[in-house]
């Protein structure tokens, strides 16, 4: 919570004393999914927002997860079992605060998002703890091309706007991304980016794609890289264990993503793409649709 308080203080210092008022409610929703060797994780997320003025917005939401597990063995302290099947449930309720400035020189937004542990920890939908993520994004438009960059600090590795991760984590991390978007036509664009996640200290990983045993012994945590699961990469502990504590180097990640998007109107968008994690030696395809009405 000290991290969250510090973030709120910094945001308070950078807010302008006055801003042109443009208040109003908004409602948005999205449905997206990511598929890889561990299974398919999909998420639908309704969000209610309120614009205080042109620069400051708050929002609340609640995600719902749908997970199709692949038929791979899991290794924990209990005997291995098949992880094939389907699971669903709510994730962590969240509240966000966003400050943004748009001008000819630079577009900037700073977002603080807090989550409450309302999701099922045993299914990997929650860490069982309150989390905070402070992200800062910069972009500038050059005709049809818009480069962008982002940097943030959090105590969890969050899903991105287009990528639903196969795990939830608890531990201090920094996250970074840089890339660009090119407008092919008025409503069609292609994008690419490189990303990195740098962890600090031990990280607890909760898998969304490995079933937890119902027996008492199965709830014990494992040790990374000691199983005989589907993955040959010892870093992919989320494919072999439902919950485990790992050192920072296991949670570190870097890779590239590419996607295209279609926005027939300002209220509707669709995207699909591919992400390659170099650290995890992991390929993922993803998709998403979304809508937005109001301010």
Q: Over which residues does each language-model region extend?
A:
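Transmembrane beta-strands of outer-membrane beta-barrel pores
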Residues: 31-37, 62-68, 101, 114-120, ...
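Extracellular loop and loop/strand-boundary signature of outer-membrane beta-barrel proteins
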Residues: 32-34, 78-84, 119-124, 161-167, ...
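Repeated loop/turn-to-beta-strand initiation elements of outer-membrane beta-barrel proteins
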Residues: 55-60, 104-108, 144-149, 186-190, ...
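Residues on the lipid-exposed face of transmembrane beta-strands in outer-membrane beta-barrel proteins
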Residues: 46-50, 60, 95-99, 112, ...
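Outer-membrane beta-barrel translocator domains and adjoining extracellular loop/strand segments
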Residues: 38-45, 70-77, 110, 120-128, ...
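Outer membrane beta-barrel transmembrane domains
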Residues: 71-83, 175, 179-295
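Short glycine/proline- and aromatic-enriched beta-strand/turn motifs that initiate or cap beta-hairpins
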Residues: 18-52, 57-59, 65
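Residues that define the transmembrane beta-barrel architecture of outer-membrane proteins
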Residues: 40-44, 88-93, 126-132, 166-176, ...
């Amino acid at each position: 919570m000290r991290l969250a308080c510090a973030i709120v203080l910094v945001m308070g210092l950078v807010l302008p004393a006055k801003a042109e008022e443009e208040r109003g409610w908004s409602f948005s929703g999205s449905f997206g999914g990511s598929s890889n060797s561990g299974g398919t994780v999909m998420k639908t997320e309704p969000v209610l927002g309120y614009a205080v003025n042109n620069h400051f917005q708050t929002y609340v939401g609640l995600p719902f997860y749908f997970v199709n597990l692949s038929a791979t063995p899991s290794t924990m302290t209990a005997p291995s079992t098949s992880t094939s099947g389907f699971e669903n449930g709510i994730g962590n309720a969240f509240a966000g605060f966003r400050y943004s400035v748009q001008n000819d020189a630079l577009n900037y937004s700073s977002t603080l998002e807090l989550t409450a542990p309302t999701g099922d920890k045993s299914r990997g939908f929650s860490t069982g703890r309150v989390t905070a993520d402070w992200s800062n994004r910069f972009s500038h438009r050059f005709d049809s091309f818009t480069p962008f960059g982002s940097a943030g600090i959090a105590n969890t590795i969050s899903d991105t706007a287009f990528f639903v991760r196969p795990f939830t984590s608890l531990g201090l991390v920094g996250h970074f991304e840089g890339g660009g978007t090119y407008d092919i036509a008025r409503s069609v664009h292609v994008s690419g980016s490189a990303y990195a996640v740098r962890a600090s200290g031990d990280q607890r990983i909760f898998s969304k794609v490995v079933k937890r045993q119902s027996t008492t012994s199965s709830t014990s945590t494992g040790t990374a890289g000691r199983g005989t699961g589907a993955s040959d990469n010892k870093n992919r502990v989320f494919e072999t264990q439902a919950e485990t504590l790992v050192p920072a180097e296991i949670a570190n990640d870097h890779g590239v993503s590419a996607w295209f998007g279609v926005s027939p109107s300002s209220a509707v968008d669709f995207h699909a793409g591919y992400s390659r994690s170099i650290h995890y030696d992991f390929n993922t395809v993803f998709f998403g649709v979304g809508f937005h009405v109001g301010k």
